[in-house]
């Protein structure tokens, strides 16, 4: 085993609310097991993290850079995912510091693409199913809410490039530089 891509974790709000304990375990025990496997086989790892480690997006449109920490609600119902992703990054960093494992962190932003499950609580499939069913398109937030979108194929290319870099560049944000106002 030369390469491990660790993406095992629910990503839709409905799933990590329904499966809070499993989400928590995926971000802790699951990460540890992947890193123990990497330690055993001297494998390189790309760990799938998330932009949620930065906390809610500021209203002023501030773009987070990889060196910022962000702020999250440690006790919210989403904390199993949001704080779980921060904790998973800590596990990765500690394994690197203690055991020398070559682990890279990919912080994924809002990703979309083919085969996304419908009725799963993800923004793009929810818009599509609501439009097809003649329902209103519900936007969480107000008319100023903006988001960036990342096509899944571009994300896969980026993660593959991250895996193949000679040196670990540190955590990398995988998202678009283009913000889209959802009211458009």
Residue ranges and their predicted role:
Residues 73, 144-145:
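Catalytic Tyr-x(3-8)-Lys segment
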Residues 1-109:
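N-terminal Rossmann-like NAD(P)+-binding domain of SDR-like oxidoreductases, especially those catalyzing
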Residues 29, 33-37, 149, 154-157, ...:
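Conserved mid-core alpha-helix of short-chain dehydrogenase/reductase
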Residues 58, 86, 111-126, 135, ...:
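Glycine/proline-rich active-site loop of Rossmann-fold NAD(P)-dependent oxidoreductases
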Residues 38, 96, 131, 139, ...:
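Hydrophobic pocket-lining residues that define ligand/cofactor binding sites across diverse proteins
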Residues 105, 149, 179:
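Short aromatic/basic micro-patch
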């Amino acid at each position: 085993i030369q390469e491990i891509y660790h993406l095992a974790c629910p990503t839709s709000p409905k799933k990590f609310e329904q499966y809070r304990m499993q989400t928590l375990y995926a971000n802790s025990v699951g990460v540890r097991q992947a890193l123990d496997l990497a330690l055993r086989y001297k494998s390189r790892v790309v760990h799938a993290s998330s932009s949620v480690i930065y906390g809610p997006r500021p209203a002023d449109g501030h773009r987070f850079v990889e060196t910022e920490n962000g702020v999250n609600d440690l006790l919210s119902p989403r904390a199993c995912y949001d704080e779980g992703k921060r904790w998973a990054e800590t596990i990765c960093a500690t394994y690197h510091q203690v055991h020398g494992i070559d682990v890279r962190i990919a912080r994924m932003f809002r990703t979309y693409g083919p085969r996304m499950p419908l009725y799963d609580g993800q923004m793009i499939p929810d818009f599509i199913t609501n439009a097809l069913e003649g329902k209103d398109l519900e936007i969480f937030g107000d008319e100023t809410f903006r988001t960036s979108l990342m096509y899944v194929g571009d994300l896969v290319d980026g993660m593959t490039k991250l895996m193949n870099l000679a040196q670990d560049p540190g955590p990398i944000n995988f998202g678009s530089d283009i913000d889209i106002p959802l009211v458009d």
